[in-house]
Amino acid sequence: MGKIALAMTTTHGPQLHTTAEQWALRLPADHKNMHPYRDGVYNFNDLVELRKGENLAERSTMSAMKQARERCEQAMTTMADKWAEVNPDIAIIFGNDQHEIYGDDLNPPFMVYYGAKIPHYPASEETRKSAPPGIAEAEAGHAAPEYREYDGIPDLGEHIISTLVEHDFDVTASKSWPRGSKNGASHAFGHIYRQVMRDKVVPNIPIYQNTFFPPNQPSAKRAYEFGKCVKKAIDSWQTDKKIAVFGSGGMTHFTIDEEFDRAFIDALKRRDKQWLTSIPLKTLQAGTSELKSWISMAGFLENEET
């Protein structure tokens, strides 16, 4: 079996790929949309009233946002530098899709990609025009600047799939992207390729989970057990390669709940399986749902020394 040389979790939101000055481009959508927050669903004005004692206005000044953007950039640089220092041979990436390659016609709860090549497309002009303000501007942070192909790991992918099936996961297997898809790897994976690997992409296995869209979102408990089972496959795969594992997505958004984020990170640190797997599905909605990729990675690392 290979050595788990590195484990990382990261958000991949558009704020990481845009300037602080561009963050306000999301305001019209924020005003229009309904937002899950602490098991309820609210409009923008109701959230302002509900959270008026938190001094959020002070944290939304341009000066404060620039400082926050700088901290984010420093954190991403630290991650990329650590990646380069460890220099893993291959990677396992837990992520999700947001109607980039899957849609309402087919949206698997779990999918393992086992193709020989992983297509990574630049954002098309159609995609840029149809994307909401603040999203189109972020495309360069995760979409390839030109068409690229990265190496998959077909034998490992097949082994993961067969192990999952053996342990009662009815997982979707994908040897190529759905017909007609011109997006290739979803932004959860493109963020890792571009921002952490800095475009020097090692052979990897993209593992998809439908965190986002009802009605077939896996529970936190199922996400944890899924990651744990993927680790069983890695442990029984014969290799001497250094392996990295990623959880891509989160944290709470679009309504930020820093108290929950900190509690979640604390649970990860103390390996509190009970806390992580007990988070109700109604809490893990919208962008916050992507934390299930982190929960899968926690299951993956359950018996791993760190």
What do the predicted segments below correspond to?
Residues 248, 254-255:
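A structural signal for small-residue-enriched, beta-sheet-centric alpha/beta enzyme cores
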Residues 1-88, 108-228, 233-236, 256-306:
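Flexible, D/E/H-enriched segments
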Residues 103:
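Active-site pocket-lining segments that scaffold enzyme catalytic pockets across diverse folds
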Residues 12-14, 95-98:
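Short glycine-rich, polar/acidic loop-and-turn segments at beta strand-coil junctions
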Residues 241-243, 254, 285:
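Basic polyanion-binding and macromolecular-assembly surfaces
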Residues 89-95, 207, 241-249:
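Beta-strand elements within well-structured catalytic alpha/beta cores of enzymes
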Residues 97-99, 251-252:
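Catalytic metal-binding/acid-base residues of hydrolase active sites
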